[in-house]
């Protein structure tokens, strides 16, 4: 037998997703071909369990899911339900009718059989008790054996029927969960922009992870309890009255009186669960925002701000969670104390009022009836509680699915035509970002929101933040001629994005008509990339056409980039393209559209993030090239040098369209006001004209050189495409995301120790365990006291009356209640502290993790820790409490049985050995299945996150079905792992029930030879309790181990190295730095080499340069050359592998990251806007006054726009708010102006702004950042032409550096890289 040691096994969830889409698909599920006996004993799971004992279970070792559970077969059932608001009861009732009554009638039959057995089993016990009371002369061994077997069969049938009830209802719960999850995802793909503002990705994530799970929990057994338990209670009550007469009614009355209290407590549990979910939603939204914007948060040094925001929501969640658990504990106490009071009250009336004597058959038959009665009476309030807890979840799901449907029905309806001969038209079109012109308050309406802008989320409601009341586009007429190029231009916030969103149906059409071709490809300004290979991002679900694919790579200028990638076109792209430059993202985005071969292409700013040379190539060879030339093309751009090449031009200004050809528009006033950019470039053109060295011959040579480069690229196109023999090796070499670590074997003891320390201390924990043991010992003493009482009445030699025994019984109940309260208080405090500390540590660990951590771990994987794993930890109290409760009960019961019948210890040892072997066989596989299940959730979250961010792209390419299939496959994987894990539960459940029943039989058998009737009966009744508790014990122990595997996964992330851990901060040096460091702003790069990963080539190669105080530096180079890497190195987002960087003579590796990043200003290429007020987005720490904020907004030309908003700078905006890309960049620039740092880095800050606005901003920067050192990365020559010096970077090397006095010399230098950069920017302006 192989010993399983603690090892680490790595599973890539992306690989997991692929593997599970097709693994074992055609295999028949073992359940479907199992024999009757195998189905009864669940032996069809045994092959997997045995294999899992000797080997670590992998996904391929788990059989396929039965067809009946697969989501593609269950989701259509939900399509029959018409989702409406306030239909929370309607959805639950529909699932009853369509899932339970149609698909799972067997579960009801099995539960009814179980209820019948629960009524008959006390009669079997009564017959046995009557037999053991007989005189020895009246006893027969065979008759006694018959009664012992009778007791055995009652216990066995009851246990086995319960196991099958659990299994059938589990299947129902899984079907419901899978169907709802798939339905929610399908509706997510239909969310409009308005819908995305109503429901963030975090909210939808919570619907899937929490609310769908609540449905699964309820439809696992609870719905049957509500159906069968009332009938079962009535039958048992009748049997109780037959046994002890009306005295039983007194006990039942107390039980009934406890139900309203229990129901009240359950309602409180439901109330605080709802509040807890509310704050959980907000926490998840903030965490999603933090993860999505983590790079910019680090650049701004805002991690602490976001951590504090999240902790604020977590604190509120924990307060409500604590109250929920407190009421849950009170409910449990009421049930347990009332069960004791039920007995004492019944026997009090029976003896003192009815004047009858307590006998063994009366006492223990009544105990057995009350025990069987206790279960439905306990489960019924729990089922009601779960139903009450389910209703808020049902309401949330119904509201989402209803409102989503409403949103989609109100989306603009467009007329589609086949072919490319039809003009694209908007006729009298009026559009609004709010569906059906719904009003969304842009201010803070409630007092709650006034006090806390995190109690979100009110949104800005249009294309730009300029307009708050009117339609964004009103009564417009638009035409894009068929087969022609139409260019749309206009200043920031003019309505360009609204227009193209109106064309593709992504904005609400109030009136008018839109006509558009049948197939449309759309490229968003913010590229949508999925975590897959570069090839798959371009193909995007379409079959491979190699000839077209090669032409697309060439047309989109991707050949040079692919040559430098380790896996060529099979290089893995991280989420949101984290391992690509902005230009590379845009070109892959463009390549996807070009490959699709659509009738129409709508391109939103595809040229903004690339250098001029690449932009020219893209325009000439892609937009005007062979593959797209005869198609209808609509290009939104600020690159006005391309306007003369357009067949049709549309100018937008404040939502008003002016359109026509270039010749028709160039003399019009409105057009000229937009085209002021021409004047910005006169200086550059004059500079070129004044140098006669640029003659025609040299220009022809430049063009000839470019053509030669392009020809060389065509020749080498095959070198960047992996063939079938290279693909596996290339995919392995190009892998970005690391495999998700999966522990195997038992959860390490250190994890338990760590969890105990987070909760309190070892002394506290072991004291808590003792409270459980003592309270359960007191509970079993109730029965022992009844034995003494009955024994005295039987022998009639006692001197004490019934009042004495009743008084002491009440004393035992009082003591039991005290210890019960203490144990629940202790476990409540313990688990709450553990949950709080784990989340706090996880949050700080993720917040301060290195950038590389986010490069190699998907957002779905990280979100999984904060959603499902934290939810598991939050609810660990219930499992731990039950584990300690049943464990202590089993311990005390076994000890009592051994004391009564010492000889029973020998067969018990054999049963214990069998028990150990069975649970070991089960536990090995069960833990691995649970770990695989945990990992299998990550693809679900990742697909949801990806899809939410790329809804417009997915819809425009009509890829909804493919993404739904991906999601359904991932859901099936998750259900499949849970299904086999749960079926394994039932396998061990049957085995343990056999062990328990054997223990009952042994107790009964040995009791036949025991002269003490009272102790004999006590031993049998105690053994009967084992039939439930022994199985429950192992189940709760495994469940607790599984919960601890979530703790284990969280701990793995907590132990991740933090950013900057590898560097030695000189605290003395940092403490001596002036508060306003750096005071000069001098920068030195000394032989700097940067590698993104150790196994990759350097992205910066031995770069050295010095920058003086207050110097203005421009950095240029083609896309992917290393410009942004220079910025990342300065902020220590990536540590130098060689060399060093100094600021004001200080080695930046010797100071803390917080100090460094707080001292540098940044205006990033991709702006970051989070949910909150405009004020918070500009000044998150509340450092600046209103007047300072308004002055900064005035400098970036946003003051007038924001002053029109009802709440001004206190207007709440959202991550999905329809601020234009340019407006977001202006807000980022406002942050820099407010901060006024000595050192500022501008990374393509004007790339998505029109030239006129960019020119104004450049003037503003020059006027307001005069005493600072600035480094500016730009593709626009006018942005950096006034720099003191210009650095030219190519392929990670600094190839040129010169001051502004030598600019003309470099422009005229034939071999200068800078010349090519300028040439491609300025050539088209010569036509003006």
Curated annotation (Swiss-Prot):
Membrane topology: Multi-pass membrane protein
GO BP field: sorocarp development; transmembrane transport
Superkingdom of origin: Eukaryota
Chief localisation class: membrane
Any Gene Ontology CC annotation: membrane
InterPro entries to which the protein is assigned, alphabetical: AAA+_ATPase, ABC1_TM_dom, ABC1_TM_sf, ABC_transporter-like_ATP-bd, ABC_transporter-like_CS, ABC_transporter_C-like, ABCC_6TM_D1, ABCC_6TM_D2
Pfam family, one: ABC_membrane
Example of a GO MF term: ATP hydrolysis activity
Domain ABC transmembrane type-1 span(s) in chain numbering: 104-389, 765-1046
TM spans (from-to): 112-132, 140-160, 224-244, 245-265, 287-307, 333-353, 762-782, 802-822, 894-914, 988-1008, 1014-1034
Keyword vocabulary terms for this entry: ATP-binding, Membrane, Nucleotide-binding, Repeat, Transmembrane, Transmembrane helix, Transport
Compositional bias annotation for Low complexity: 684-695
Binding site for ATP: 490-497, 1117-1124
Subcellular location as annotated: Membrane
Gene3D superfamilies (UniProt xref): ABC transporter type 1, transmembrane domain, P-loop containing nucleotide triphosphate hydrolases
Domain ABC transporter, first and last residues per copy: 457-678, 1083-1316
Region feature (Disordered): 684-708
Family: Belongs to the ABC transporter superfamily. ABCC family. Conjugate transporter (TC 3.A.1.208) subfamily.
Protein name per UniProt: ABC transporter C family member 7
Organism: Dictyostelium discoideum (Social amoeba)
